[in-house]
């Protein structure tokens, strides 16, 4: 659970506070502890754990952190090529929030249904705020991507780096978001 995640981070901080670790060393220590606590060795079990509704929200936070860190260290990475300046600014200004709501980019109820396996897979999911999720309702992918596009203009308003990259992966068009 999220509270368990918070507890170990606080405990790691307390343990490191007397060791005079620099920021980089402390971050390396945290990442090692995180990998030990959240192993991804069994690919089948990991894939099953990344399915809605059983997915732990931690994985969305972890991915957004990895994407954010990669952008901070390697903004020229192929992953970010093709991003518009507003999208890059949105990632730079990204603020981690206690978002708790999981959104299906392709809606669960749609005139163009998807296979359950694809609909509830991590690739079709993003974690966003409850208020942004309620605005999504059962809207189509194009409407949802339009809202992601609107977020780029508002500093610090990006809900999910993952969702922005999903938008980019679909070449910013609803028709390109498919199973």
Language-model segments: which ranges?
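Flexible coil/loop and intrinsically disordered segments
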Residues: 1-179
């Amino acid at each position: 659970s999220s509270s368990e995640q918070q507890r170990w981070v606080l405990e790691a901080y307390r343990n490191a506070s007397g060791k005079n670790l620099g920021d980089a060393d402390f971050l390396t220590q945290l990442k090692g502890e995180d990998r030990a606590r959240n192993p991804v060795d069994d690919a089948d079990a990991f894939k099953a754990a990344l399915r809605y509704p059983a997915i732990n929200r931690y994985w969305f936070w972890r991915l957004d952190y990895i994407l954010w860190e990669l952008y901070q260290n390697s903004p020229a990475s192929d992953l970010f090529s093709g991003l518009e300046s507003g999208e890059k600014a949105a990632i730079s200004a990204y603020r981690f929030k206690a978002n708790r709501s999981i959104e299906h980019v392709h809606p669960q109820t749609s005139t163009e249904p998807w296979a359950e396996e694809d609909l509830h897979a991590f690739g079709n999911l993003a974690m966003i705020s409850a208020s942004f999720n309620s605005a999504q309702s059962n809207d189509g992918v194009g409407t949802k991507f339009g809202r992601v596009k609107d977020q780029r203009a508002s500093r610090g308003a990006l809900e999910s780096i993952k969702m922005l990259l999903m938008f980019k992966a679909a070449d910013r068009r609803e028709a390109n978001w498919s199973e």
